[in-house]
Amino acid sequence: MRTSQYLLSTLKETPADAEVISHQLMLRAGMIRKLASGLYTWLPTGLRVLKKVENIVREEMNNAGAIEVSMPVVQPAELWQESGRWEQYGPELLRFVDRGDRAFVLGPTHEEVITDLIRNELSSYKQLPLNFYQIQTKFRDEVRPRFGVMRSREFLMKDAYSFHTTQESLQQTYDAMYEAYSKIFTRMGLDFRPVQADTGSIGGSASHEFQVLAQSGEDDIVFSDTSDFAANIELAEAVAPLTPRAAATQEMTLVDTPNAKTIAELVEQFNLPIEKTVKTLLVKAAEGSEFPLVALLVRGDHELNEVKAEKLAQVASPLTFATEAEIRAAVNAGPGSLGPVNMPVPVVIDRSVAAMSDFAAGANIDGKHYFGINWDRDVATPQVADIRNVVAGDPSPDGQGTLLIKRGIEVGHIFQLGTKYSDALKASVQGEDGRNQVLTMGCYGIGVTRVVAAAIEQNHDERGIVWPDAIAPFQVAILPMNMHKSFRVQELAEKLYAELRAKGIDVLMDDRKERPGVMFADMELIGIPHTVVIGDRNLDNDEIEYKYRRDGEKKMIKTGDILDYLVANVKR
């Protein structure tokens, strides 16, 4: 490709509304342009990267035995009503009616559609297992689209769905997808980790996320420092304290705390160790419960894990925090003064809270706290559960080492769905014994557009993007200095350009009448891994300058060797 025949829409300034580095660089490098909130046009440079990501995904899915299909973006509401997700999914599901007053949705995912297809196409266990995938546009009406294509409303996704008659067969395909995903992200040159994860709104049992490590990541991922344990913080078990609860040394006293409405204020004003405080959060109780609310208690320096809390039988799903009015109606005190003593609604405490003694908590009286609370003396020990986020330094749940926490960007997710959708949509085949058998399913997703942003978050410097070779928009940039004035520069540039293309290498030749500084800045901003600079001065010595974008290393290479050097060093 020649820049004179290409749309090279680079920007010098960073757009003010771009929050994260990937969004900033995708705009500056001319990869995307915003059309509306959460909607982006992909320009040629961005589309080249997107297609390379897509091709790697497609190759590895095909290698793993998956079969490509294409399903409609628009889906009839009846399928979502049949599965039960019409009510469950929430406002992210864009719903509309056509001119015939029939209800439809814009698909955020395709479990219902593929299950409907399979229940009508398959009849015997002999046709299974099968694994279908597509790479297709999805739409989720995000309440607050942000971070460019990292959290957009319209996005490209690879979604796959497998069907089985046994759990063993599902496990084999799940393992094959785990391996395929590992190959996909390795080929893309990404530093990633597969981690145990929650199944979320998709449903099912076993689940793994593939997380690209990056400081800007939205997820906290947890690792053991000595074993292979890795999990999303939502799922990581907080191991119960190993030391027994200390004996009481204080009497419980009622203390006036009119200006201490938060744990931080309580600690500061009364010089308390934060690990000796307890915070109480009230959430709505499950439907049909005797009480309207449930009190959840965690240590003052810990955070409630909402995913764990939502799984408690007495807690409403989705987890909903009580309003101040609801709290006052149930407890007769405000949110800043809540605690376990005389709490009139059911209480669940975290394991770490159960191990505390002589602790401080709200007195369920406005402006007052109890200090020196002890379990089984001042208040009976209530239900104990793991309801907090782990913190760095906690013991690893596998009993090996301690936990580290890093930020990650989720780019892939695999699920063992079981029979959630096949039960709801009555998808079955005739089993080996002649009886009807409900199908077992797996679901496997990759956020193709998200991968592009995640790769940039992990691969950039002060000058721009630093693409891994496999997904770079171009692998080689040719920068001929003053080619319009020098015949030999032009001749050699054209020759090298043709030879690289003949070798199947993606090459961009900058044939603009631009200053060298502009040419260098654009190529570094775009992030092309390999750059060759052809100039009269170096040609006097029969040499060409080569620069590797990732480490900035420059070297002089003989003109007769440059083609072989590039062919040997470009990773494909």
From Swiss-Prot:
CDD domains: ProRS-INS, ProRS_anticodon_short, ProRS_core_prok. Its main location: cytoplasm. It is found in: Cytoplasm. The keyword Zinc does not apply. GO terms for cellular component: cytosol. InterPro entries: aa-tRNA-synt_IIb (IPR002314), aa-tRNA-synth_II (IPR006195), aa-tRNA-synth_II/BPL/LPL (IPR045864), Anticodon-bd (IPR004154), Anticodon-bd_dom_sf (IPR036621), Pro-tRNA-ligase_IIa (IPR002316), Pro-tRNA-synth_IIa_bac-type (IPR004500), Pro-tRNA-Synthase_IIa_type1 (IPR023717). Its EC number is 6.1.1.15. One of its GO terms (biological process) is prolyl-tRNA aminoacylation. It is an enzyme of class 6 (ligase). SUPFAM superfamilies: Class II aaRS ABD-related, Class II aaRS and biotin synthetases, YbaK/ProRS associated domain. It catalyses: tRNA(Pro) + L-proline + ATP = L-prolyl-tRNA(Pro) + AMP + diphosphate. Transmembrane segments: none annotated. It comes from the Bacteria. One of its GO terms (molecular function) is ATP binding. PROSITE patterns: AA_TRNA_LIGASE_II. Keywords: Aminoacyl-tRNA synthetase, ATP-binding, Cytoplasm, Ligase, Nucleotide-binding, Protein biosynthesis. It holds the Pfam family HGTP_anticodon. Consists of three domains: the N-terminal catalytic domain, the editing domain and the C-terminal anticodon-binding domain. Homodimer. Catalyzes the attachment of proline to tRNA(Pro) in a two-step reaction: proline is first activated by ATP to form Pro-AMP and then transferred to the acceptor end of tRNA(Pro). As ProRS can inadvertently accommodate and process non-cognate amino acids such as alanine and cysteine, to avoid such errors it has two additional distinct editing activities against alanine. One activity is designated as 'pretransfer' editing and involves the tRNA(Pro)-independent hydrolysis of activated Ala-AMP. Belongs to the class-II aminoacyl-tRNA synthetase family. ProS type 1 subfamily. This is Proline--tRNA ligase. The lineage of its organism: Bacteria, Pseudomonadati, Pseudomonadota, Gammaproteobacteria, Enterobacterales.
